[in-house]
Amino acid sequence: MKIGIITDIHSNIQALNAVLNEFDKLKVDKIICCGDLIGIGINPEETVQALLKRKEMLIAVRGNHEQYLLKGLPKEIHDDKRKMSEKEIANHKWNHNKLSDQSINFLRSLEISQNIELGGKRLYIVHYPQQADGTYKKHIKNPSATDNVEMFKENDADIFLYGHTHTFSVNNINDKWYINTGALGCPMNSNIARAGVLKINDEQIKFESINVEYNVKEVIDEINNLKFPFYEEILKIFY
C-alpha cells in the first residue's frame, strides 16, 4: 500500500495541485492530511474543493485553523500565549468568508484525530498531540525520538502522523514511526511544496519525503496584488 502524506496546506492551491499531481504519478492508494487545510493563504475554497474531488481516497483531521472556523477564534494563540492582533483576526475572517457551505460542512465532518489500520499497521493521525483539556502540547519544532515518545505517550500505534510545526521531522524508535512532513503550503524561502509517501508492504514500513517544485513567485505576486488583511506579515513569516 502506498499512502500520500500531507499537512498544513494553508489555502495554497498551487502547492496542493503540484503535490496531488505528483501523487497521481506515484499512484498512491490513499491520501492522509494532518490538518490545517485552510488559513494563511488566499485560496481556501479551491483547496477544500480539490480535496473533496478525492474524498474517496482522503483521510483528514482538523487542525487549529479548522477549529478557528468552527469553534471561533481563541482569546490567545496557543503556542506563544499572546492575543491575536486586529489584523490577524481580520485575516481569519477574510479567509473564512471565502468558503462555501459545502466546504464548511466538509471541514465540520473532520475529526480531531483518527486511529485507523492500513496495510496491517495501526496509524494515529492528529494535527498535533493534545493535553487532556484539548489544548496542544508543547510546540517542539525539531523533536528527538525521545520527545516524540513523550508527545504521544497516551496513544498506541505503529505510525504517528502529525503536523502543525511546519517543520519536517521523522523519527523511528522501538519499531514506531513518528512523521511530520512539514508544511505543504508554507514554502518559507524555498520553491517547494513538502509532502511524503508512506509504503506499507509485507509488514514493512518505508517512508520517503518528497519536495515538489512549483511557482512560488506566482503565489507571492497574487498575495501582493490582493493586499488582504495581514498579508505583509504572512509573506514575511510563511513565504
Question: Locations of the language-model features?
Answer:
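Beta-strand-turn-beta hairpins that frame and shape the catalytic cleft
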Residues: M1-I3, N115-Y124, I173-W177, Q204-K206
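Acidic, His/Gly-rich catalytic cores of divalent-metal-dependent hydrolytic chemistry
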Residues: N171-Y239
